[in-house]
Curated annotation (Swiss-Prot):
Subunit structure and binding partners: Identified in the spliceosome C complex.
Name of the gene this protein is made from: DHX38
Comp. bias intervals (Acidic residues): 300-310
Residues annotated to bind ATP: 555-562
InterPro entries assigned to the protein according to its UniProt record, in alphabetical order: DEAD-box_helicase_OB_fold, DEAD/DEAH_box_helicase_dom, DNA/RNA_helicase_DEAH_CS, HA2_WH, Helicase-assoc_dom, Helicase_ATP-bd, Helicase_C-like, P-loop_NTPase
Region of interest (Disordered), ranges: 60-320, 1155-1227
Subcellular location: Nucleus
Record organism: Homo sapiens (Human)
Segments forming domain Helicase C-terminal: 727-902
Disease the record associates with this protein: Retinitis pigmentosa 84: A form of retinitis pigmentosa, a retinal dystrophy belonging to the group of pigmentary retinopathies. Retinitis pigmentosa is characterized by retinal pigment deposits visible on fundus examination and primary loss of rod photoreceptor cells followed by secondary loss of cone photoreceptors. Patients typically have night vision blindness and loss of midperipheral visual field. As their condition progresses, they lose their far peripheral visual field and eventually central vision as well.
Domain named Helicase ATP-binding: residues: 542-705
Keywords, comma-separated and alphabetical: Acetylation, ATP-binding, Disease variant, Helicase, Hydrolase, Isopeptide bond, mRNA processing, mRNA splicing, Nucleotide-binding, Nucleus, Phosphoprotein, Retinitis pigmentosa, Spliceosome, Ubl conjugation
Protein name: Pre-mRNA-splicing factor ATP-dependent RNA helicase PRP16
Length: 1227
């Protein structure tokens, strides 16, 4: 280390001297010599080879020639040429001004020459150089001209230009090795942006040439207020130039050489060799052409000499700083060296103006189509009015206009529906609510606010990006972390789907149920049976049953009707002649009661006592008592009209009045009339037994007295706005009070049950030291293993809280229930004749339902019932009994079923409550449209096949037609997708992302085909749940679709219907959809608006439809259903051809033909009507003959007379025996 104490240019950090100062950073000032740099011209150095004399000679010759050329003005000159000429004049003045400036170009060669690659040493001869310059001068004198040559010649010219450029560049490179620096640095200015504004030229205002001014300014550091023009560079020049490249003169090339660095952005250069510009401390990073250097190279020396030591030290510091800047730059550019970092305001302004001119307003395909429609309509109006006349025919007319199909609509009604035949005695529709303006009805329409909030939170939580999970990310893929798929129980080992897996209860019911209440623990099963109220009147009941074929039994909930009646009949010997059947309105009730009775009889479930529900038959050859749903018994009556293998049938919970129950009443009334040995027992928990007795012909009514345990009923003081929140609070209050016993909460539907269960669990987690509570939901769609959990005993010290729909109202005895919380609402299926669809809606319950629910609390001990409505509402706002399902639902399937059972005249069928006339006529009209009924109201072969499918008639028709069209595989998937609720979901906050992903599945012609595409994509992804979540699809709904498809496929196999695929020809699928929904067709009216073809009612495409916002709107569409919200929205829309509608729906539509007149159309319509009238007359004649034959066969009506054959009895038509007196016969 040298002594640096004397050097003031060294920045030094001194240590702390405690005597003189506390500490800090001391920066010594620079010397005056380092503050002010003095630039000195280097001494002239003669060339050893005499090159300086040769260079000055050539320079003088060129200047003389240039002076002569300046006198001749070019026809076209540019601003750049003028600028360069100014630069040349200033150069000339400077060269004449001082002696040091004469050798400036010679002094510019600071760097030592590198070792060149050996090449051709020469350049071109002086003669060729002179000829070339002369040719350029002559060409420039002619000015700029426009060529009208052909494109082919222009391309040749262009290729010659490129060849010439290439040769010229090569010659310049060769020549530059032995020429001056100015010639070696040259290159033509290139630009690729022809129509755009030029990049700004950064020129020093006070500089004559790039060799002066800014490079001689004093060092201003980073904070200098005066910035060099290099610090705001222009965009990097590109390679190409316009067609004038080779037409530039030698002078122009030289000028471009001189002006290049003042116009173009210099690039960064590493300082591995000495660059004198590196001591400029503004860190520009670009190498200027010329500089008047500080140091000078002495003759014969390789190093650099400095005048003072300060200069040397400054130069070394700057070199180190330049090297440091070079290596610290990112990708060769930093904030100062980036050529794209800064631009002048003028350039930015001109660039923005240019882009603004080019900018066009974005127009969507929908808006473009709307504009075209408007323009076409306006043109058509003007032409029609005669204001303007068409002078030219538009040859670019659309082909669609030429081939557009115009449909004519007919209002054809078959003779059996024209009013001459009456089908029902109930003309007005029945509304399932007592007062639509009551508090309960309004709250039911609004729904629960808690449910709405919970739904939004759940969707948001489900759809949020889980950044903390490694699975599915790139890091997770590297580490081998994969997303775990949920196990699919429905898929067997061989990959097939078993849709019965989740519906099988027998496997979960094998275990013996343990007693949980004190009553069940202390008493044996026999003692429990004897404790029931029905045990006291056993003999009286059996006597009445023996004496009468039909008996009405009325008893309160919990009296033992369901479990004991079947056993009493079995013990009385009725099972010797056939099975005892007991119908239940719900599957869970049938399964749980069968299990209880099998335990009381000491057998296994499925042997002596069994049950049969949809998808599962748990019976055997030895079964004597069979519990089943009413739908199962209805299907059995199809195969066997008289139900011969039953000796007694118990219709349990008749007050429920389900659709199947009402149909069974009418059928069993006829069966009992034909079979005197069949016993029919109808049980009900309500007091409307007189209605049942009158229906069956004033049959006896038997009352079972008393209830097992008393129930204390508590009403709410005020109406509850949010029934879910009120139920949660009440359940927590009961639970925390410490009273023993389980809780049963009644809710309207599945979503309400799930929200209530979640809310109870959340509130309990917030409490400290809260007693344990097992929350168990139960509803019909719940898997069987979870449904069976409610019958199992909870661990000791744990209270059960069961949240259920009205599935738990009837025949469901859960041991230990002491508290019932009644929300006061239930879901009912209601038919809307206007849209022709059933809808599940929330309605207030009836008084009969309320009594049933309170009865659940007194089955195994005294209990309490909390009603979340006022006593006034119970008396004034609730109906006495629930409106029967047959009066509020679509009857199409019922009509089909009755027709298939042989009921020709529906008015003669015995309905306990006749259905409304509108519902009946709508259903029969729909069946006639679909071809299930003929013109006389008789069942067709298509209708007989439609009965087998548990589907809406239109979906059944679609499946049947698909077999003929060869696309049954695709239609089976579409029908399955339509049988489940919503497939897609839109979480709040991610609506746009959800819509974008949904658009990927969209098939522009059809929403039905979009559903098909979704299922096929899910299948291709191995039925993945993760794939569903990523694409905002309900995985549970997709699994349900797969189960429905498997079930329908089994039915098709049983009916010997072929399963075929149409491949990628999905037009056949659209035609098949049209065959089932042509009666729900709409045509385009105006812009984006449709109207129903038959009714003229306006319809709108739903925003989620694949056809919504499409550039082309089809003329005709069919839709699956109408949804009434803010507008009449069509859901599940498919574009169809007008000719398909006329072909598949001839009763409504026909194609308008130019050749046919109105008279011909009227004549054809009259012929069709007369043909139908003839058919109807023939059918009426046949019906009359059949009725007369029936009357002859049974003169006493429906009741069959019993004949006792005795000795001496003479039949009609037999000759009398002569030995016997005519008066003596009989006993």
């Amino acid at each position: 280390m040298g002594d640096t104490s004397e050097d003031a240019s060294i920045h030094r950090l001194e240590g702390t001297d405690l005597d003189c100062q506390v500490g800090g950073l001391i920066c010594k000032s620079k010397s005056a010599a380092s503050e002010q740099h003095v630039f000195k011209a280097p001494a002239p150095r003669p060339s050893l080879l005499g090159l300086d004399l040769l260079a000055s000679l050539k320079r003088r010759e060129r200047e003389e020639k240039d002076d002569g050329e300046d006198k001749k003005k070019s026809k076209v000159s540019s601003y750049k040429d003028w600028e360069e000429s100014k630069d040349d004049q200033k150069d000339a003045e400077e060269e004449g001004g001082d002696q040091a400036g004469q050798n400036i170009r010679k002094d510019r060669h600071y760097r030592s020459a590198r070792v060149e690659t050996p090449s051709h040493p020469g350049g071109v001869s002086e003669e060729f150089w002179e000829r070339s310059r002369q040719r350029e001068r002559e060409r420039r004198e002619h000015g700029v001209y426009a060529s009208s040559k052909e494109e082919k010649d222009w391309k040749k010219e262009k290729s010659r230009d490129r060849d010439y450029d290439r040769k010229r560049d090569r010659d310049e490179r060769d020549r530059s090795r032995h020429s001056s620096r100015s010639e070696r640095d040259g290159g033509s200015e290139r630009s690729s942006r022809r129509n755009e504004p030029e990049s700004p030229r950064h020129r020093p205002k006070d500089a004559a040439t790039p060799s002066r001014s800014t490079w001689e300014e004093e060092d201003s550091g980073y904070g200098s207020s005066r910035r060099s023009q290099w610090e705001s560079p222009s965009p990097t020049p590109s390679y190409r130039d316009s067609e004038r490249s080779h037409r530039l003169s030698t002078r122009d090339r030289d000028r471009s050489v001189r002006g290049k660095y003042s116009d173009d952005t210099p690039l960064p250069t590493p300082s591995y060799k000495y660059n004198e510009w590196a001591d400029d401390r503004r860190h520009l990073g670009s190498t200027p052409r010329l500089s008047r250097g500080r140091g000078r190279r002495e003759e014969g020396e390789e190093g650099i000499s400095f005048d003072t030591e300060e200069e040397r030290q400054q130069w070394e510091d700057d070199q180190r700083q330049a090297d440091r800047d070079w290596y610290m730059m990112d990708e060769g550019y930093d904030e100062f060296h980036n050529p794209l970092a800064y631009s002048s305001e003028d350039y930015v302004r001109r660039r923005e103006q240019h882009l603004h001119k080019q900018k066009q307003k974005r127009i969507s395909a929908q808006r473009r189509q709307i504009n075209e429609d408007n323009e076409r309509w306006e043109t058509n109006r003007m032409l029609t009015s005669g204001v303007v006349h068409r002078l030219e025919v538009d040859e670019d007319f659309e082909e669609d206009n030429a081939a557009k199909v115009h449909l004519m609509v007919h209002n054809l009604v078959p003779p059996f529906l024209d009013g001459r035949i009456v089908f029902t005695k109930q003309p007005e529709p029945v509304i399932p609510v007592k007062d639509a303006t009551s508090d309960l009805a309004i709250i039911a329409r609004k729904g629960s606010q808690t449910v709405r909030k919970h739904r939004e939170q759940k969707e948001r939580k489900k759809a949020q990006h889980k950044h903390w999970e490694l699975a599915g990310t790139k890091l997770g893929d590297i580490m081998g972390v994969k997303k775990e798929e949920e196990p699919d129980k429905a898929v067997t080992e061989d990959g097939k789907v078993d849709y019965r897996t989740e519906q099988k209860f027998a496997d979960h019911m094998k275990r013996k149920s343990e007693a949980s209440s004190e009553f069940a623990k202390k008493k044996s099963i026999l003692e429990q049976r004897q404790y029931l109220p029905i045990f006291a009147v056993q003999q009286e009941l059996l006597t009445i049953i023996r004496d009468n074929s039909i008996v009405i039994v009325v008893g309160e909930t919990g009296s033992g009707k369901t479990t004991q009646l079947t056993q009493y009949l079995h013990e009385d010997g009725y099972t010797d002649y056939g099975m005892i059947g007991c119908t239940q309105p719900r599957r869970v009730a049938a399964m749980s009661v069968a299990k209880r009775v099998s335990e009381e009889m000491g057998g296994n479930l499925g042997e002596e006592v069994g049950y049969a529900i949809r998808f599962e038959d748990c019976t055997s050859e030895n079964t004597l008592i069979k519990y089943m749903t009413d739908g199962i018994l209805l299907r059995e009556s199809l195969r066997e009209a008289d139900l011969d293998h039953y000796s007694a049938i118990i219709m349990d919970e008749a007050h429920e009045r389900s659709l199947n129950t009402d149909v069974l009443f009418g059928l069993l009334r006829e069966v009992v009339a034909r079979r005197s040995d069949l016993k029919l027992i109808v049980t009900s928990a309500t007091m409307d037994a007189e209605k049942f007795a009158a229906f069956f012909g004033n049959v006896p009514i038997f009352h079972i007295p008393g209830r097992t345990f008393p129930v204390d009923i508590l009403f709410s003081k005020t109406p509850q706005e949010d029934y879910v929140e009120a139920a949660v609070k009440q359940s927590l209050q009961v639970h925390l009070s410490g009273a023993p016993g389980d809780i049963l909460i009644f809710m309207p539907g599945q979503e309400d049950i799930e929200v209530t269960s979640d809310q109870i669990v959340e509130h309990l987690e917030e409490l400290e030291n809260a007693p344990a509570l097992a929350v168990l939901p139960i509803y019909s769609q719940l898997p069987s293993d979870l449904q069976a959990k409610i019958f199992q005993k909870a661990p000791d010290g744990v209270r059960k809280c069961i949240v259920a729909t009205n599935i738990a109202e009837t025949s469901l005895t859960v041991d230990g229930i002491m508290f019932v919380i009644d929300s006061g609402y239930c879901k009912l299926k209601v038919f809307n004749p206007r849209i022709g669809m059933d809808a599940l809606q929330i309605y207030p319950i009836s008084q009969a339902n309320a009594n049933q629910r309170s009865g659940r609390a007194g089955r195994t001990g005294p209990g309490q019932c909390f009603r979340l409505y006022t006593q006034s509402a119970y008396k004034n706002e609730l109906l006495t009994t629930t409106v029967p399902e047959i009066q509020r639902t679509n009857l199409a399937n019922v009509v089909l079923l009755l027709k298939s059972l042989g009921v020709q005249d529906l008015l003669q069928f015995h309905f306990m409550d006749p259905p409304p006339e509108d519902n009946m006529l709508n259903s029969m009209y729909q069946l006639w449209i679909l071809g299930a009924l003929d013109n006389t109201g008789g069942l067709t072969s298509t209708g007989r096949l439609m009965v087998e499918f548990p589907l809406d008639p239109a979906l059944s028709k679609m499946l049947i037609v698909s077999c003929d069209m060869g696309c049954s595989s695709e239609i089976l998937l579409i029908v399955s997708m339509l049988s489940v609720p919503a497939i897609f979901y839109r979480p709040k906050g991610r609506e746009e992302e959800s819509d974008q992903i949904r658009e990927k599945f969209a098939v522009p012609e059809s929403d039905h085909l979009t559903y098909l595409n979704v299922y096929l994509q899910w299948k291709n992804n191995n039925y993945s749940t993760i794939w569903c979540n990523d694409h905002f699809i309900h995985a549970k709904a997709m699994r349900k679709v797969r189960e429905v498809r498997a079930q329908l496929k089994d039915i098709m196999v049983q009916q010997r219907m072929s399963l075929a695929s149409c491949g990628t020809d999905w037009d056949i699928v659209r035609k098949c959809i049209c065959a089932a929904y042509f009666h729900q067709a709409a045509k385009l009216k105006g812009i984006g608006e449709y109207v129903n073809i038959r009714t003229g009612m306006p319809c709108h495409l739903h925003p989620t439809s694949s056809l919504f916002g499409m550039g082309y709107t089809p003329d005709y569409i069919v839709y699956h259903e109408l949804v009434m919200t803010t507008k009449e929205y069509m859901q599940c829309v498919t574009a169809v051809d007008g000719e398909w509608l006329a072909e598949l729906g001839p009763m409504f539509y026909s194609v308008k033909q130019a050749g046919k007149s109105r008279q011909e159309n009227r004549r054809r319509a009259k012929e069709e009507a007369s043909a139908m009238e003839e058919e109807m007359a023939l059918a009426e004649e046949q019906l009359r003959a059949r009725r007369q034959e029936q009357e002859k066969r049974s003169p006493l009506g429906s009741v069959r007379s019993t004949k006792i054959y005795t000795p001496g009895r003479k039949e009609q038509g037999e000759p009398m025996t002569p030995r016997r007196t005519p008066a003596r016969f009989g006993l």
